[in-house]
């Protein structure tokens, strides 16, 4: 090994010397042809009898073969869809593999929209599936396979759901819409503007203004006309059923982080974040030495943990029927004001010869940030206006599952997970058991991710126990069974359980 490293060092030195000499030469050689882009050769796969080398391990993994990725079942469970990425290609190809076929069929690019989609939503009768493709809405009738495109626009739609009456609701930016299935009418349920509400026509307040209105008839007339127009506009909004709902003004200090609509379309749960928070600063950069222009590019990255100061989030419920805003308080979260770092701060103070006095203060709370899940931290009951959310403290010591009192704007703790070190950013799946008042969830309160169910107001019940990890929760279509993955037999072996 020392001999190899010495030879590499001498080779590098020789190259450096030759390069230096070339740089100081008075004659500049002009290439006869334009140099072609250099294609990095892939490492050759080793023979079975040969051990892996460091060069092989660190090489582009294409030498191992072209793997199937992101596989999922078709809607009729008779085939599997998956993607493959050709060697050294930045693009993916998509395939369909029938369970009784010997070969997979590559999907044509103009047929991708018609392929069964992994992340769709079903109506209450499980007869239709709505999904997003390239930011537009499609609906598939599952029994016939017929697909209908409902939108074709450049502004992408970010989410959708079926309402209890069979209509489709979707949100686009900070706007929420409903597509009426009987008529095709698109109704705007909510328009959220992050700005201060207009003040409307104001009465003169200063002495000078009042005299101006009293003495000059034209000024007084303009004031009365403005008030009349405003009154007519308000009366029209209340009386005319063909108009969209009034705009919501939530202030100019925040931005919408996430929103979610209730099953009947009445309530909108919104998470708001300080608009000035970016998660990084001008000092949080990483140099890219392979910039396309030949220079070192400063690439923005997230702030270091010790320097980041996330502001938390504010939560509101918008009652779309009553046009009423309800601010959600966090006092219902057990330990929301605990000084969870008191022990560490006390030790640090003692080392300095000082004393530390612990005090209670509200902690910063935000929706749970999970690195692995595809679900949302906001979970509505399948058919009722019952809401559960998963939130975390920005100090990373606590995670809560809380139900939400929509009328009063209060969190009610259903489960609290505390970790003196760091709450895991994985194993956080949760949701409602259909047709019940119970939640299912994963928790590492025993040190291992285990599965629990809990009825509101009652104690949780563990469905799994032991020194193994449970993950990937899936409910059966009839909700009578829960499927999960666990490494119960061996830490490196995962099996599916029911």
Regions found by a protein language model. Give the residues of each.
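Bacterial N-terminal signal peptides that target proteins for export
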Residues: 1-9
């Amino acid at each position: 090994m020392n001999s190899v490293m010495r030879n590499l060092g001498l080779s590098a030195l020789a190259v450096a010397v030759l390069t230096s000499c070339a740089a100081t030469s008075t004659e500049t050689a002009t290439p006869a042809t334009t140099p072609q882009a250099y294609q990095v050769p892939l490492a050759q796969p080793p023979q079975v009898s040969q051990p892996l080398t460091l060069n092989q391990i660190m090489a582009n993994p294409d030498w191992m073969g072209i793997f199937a990725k992101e596989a999922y079942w078709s809607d009729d469970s008779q085939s599997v869809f998956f993607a493959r990425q050709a060697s050294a290609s930045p693009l993916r190809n998509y395939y369909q593999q029938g369970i009784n076929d010997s070969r997979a069929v590559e999907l044509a690019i103009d047929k991708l929209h018609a392929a069964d989609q992994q992340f769709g939503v079903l109506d209450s009768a499980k007869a239709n599936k709505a999904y997003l493709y390239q930011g537009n809405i499609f609906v598939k009738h599952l029994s016939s396979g017929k697909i209908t495109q409902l939108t074709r626009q450049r502004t992408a739609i970010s989410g959708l759901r079926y309402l209890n009456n069979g209509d489709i609701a979707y949100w686009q930016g900070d706007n929420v819409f409903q597509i009426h299935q009987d008529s095709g009418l698109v109704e705007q349920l909510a328009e959220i503007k992050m700005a201060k509400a207009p003040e409307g026509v104001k009465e003169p307040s200063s002495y000078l203004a009042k005299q101006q209105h009293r003495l000059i008839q034209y000024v007084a007339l303009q004031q009365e006309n403005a008030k009349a127009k405003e009154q007519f506009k308000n009366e029209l909004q209340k009386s005319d059923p063909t108009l969209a709902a009034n705009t919501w003004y939530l202030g100019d200090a925040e931005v919408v982080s996430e929103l979610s609509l209730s099953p009947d379309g009445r309530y909108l749960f919104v998470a708001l974040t300080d608009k000035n928070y970016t998660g990084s600063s001008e000092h949080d950069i990483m140099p890219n030495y392979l910039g396309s222009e030949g220079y070192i590019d400063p690439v923005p990255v997230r702030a270091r943990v010790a320097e980041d100061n996330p502001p938390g989030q504010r939560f509101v419920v918008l009652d779309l029927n009553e046009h009423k805003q309800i601010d959600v308080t966090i006092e219902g979260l057990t330990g929301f004001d605990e000084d969870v770092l008191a022990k560490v701060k006390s030790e640090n103070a003692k080392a300095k010869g000082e004393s530390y006095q612990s005090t209670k203060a509200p902690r910063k709370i935000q929706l749970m940030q999970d690195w692995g899940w595809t679900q949302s931290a906001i979970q509505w009951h399948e058919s009722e206006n019952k809401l559960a959310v998963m939130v975390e403290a920005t100090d990373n010591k606590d995670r809560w599952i809380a139900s939400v009192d929509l009328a009063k704007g209060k969190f009610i703790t259903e489960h609290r997970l505390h970790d003196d070190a760091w709450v895991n950013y994985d194993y956080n799946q949760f949701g409602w058991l259909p047709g019940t008042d119970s939640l299912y969830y994963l928790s590492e309160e025993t040190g291992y991710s285990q599965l629990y169910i809990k009825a509101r107001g009652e104690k949780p019940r563990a469905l799994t126990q032991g020194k193994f990890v449970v993950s990937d929760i899936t409910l059966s279509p009839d909700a009578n069974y829960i499927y999960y993955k666990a490494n119960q037999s061996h830490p490196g072996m995962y099996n599916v359980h029911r």
